[in-house]
């Protein structure tokens, strides 16, 4: 391939990449499925889930919050199993109105981070959340936490 052809291919690739819309948006995670919208078959394929639980979950929807979702799963999965599942299936919590109990359900949350989440509310934007929580954890962890949130 000539240098001119290489530049043309590179330019076309860059143009195509720039024209491709972003798939993930704030509060719309790529890897954490929404328990209120995920298909029954997808639920059944998740860790610790089966067809029976998937059918019951779909019948119980919509879950108004993460606490209600956790209560639904409580008799079906152990606390450890639920924590592992929540990394893949979740009811996104409202950043400004979630209860302490809801925030505590986010995998990996401890008392300090719960306190920090609550201290800076209300958040005017997701950028404010990133800035404030970024004082306590690195950008990768802020991004991980964002997967469980929605901004009103």
Enumerate the language-model features and the residues they cover.
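Long, highly charged, low-complexity intrinsically disordered interaction regions
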Residues: 18-105, 114, 144, 150-152
């Amino acid at each position: 391939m000539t240098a001119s052809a290489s530049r043309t291919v590179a330019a076309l690739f860059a143009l195509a990449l720039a024209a491709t819309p972003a798939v993930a948006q704030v509060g719309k995670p790529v890897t954490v499925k929404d328990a209120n919208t995920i298909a029954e078959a997808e639920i059944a394929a998740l860790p610790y889930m089966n067809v029976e639980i998937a059918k019951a979950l779909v019948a119980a929807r919509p879950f108004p919050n993460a606490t209600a979702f956790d209560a639904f799963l409580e008799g079906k999965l152990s606390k450890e199993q639920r924590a592992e599942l929540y990394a893949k299936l979740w009811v996104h919590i409202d950043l400004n109105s979630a209860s302490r109990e809801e925030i505590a359900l986010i995998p990996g949350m401890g008392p300090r981070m719960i306190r920090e989440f609550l201290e800076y509310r209300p958040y005017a934007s997701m950028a404010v959340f990133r800035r404030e929580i970024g004082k306590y954890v690195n950008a990768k962890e802020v991004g991980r936490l964002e997967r469980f949130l929605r901004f009103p």
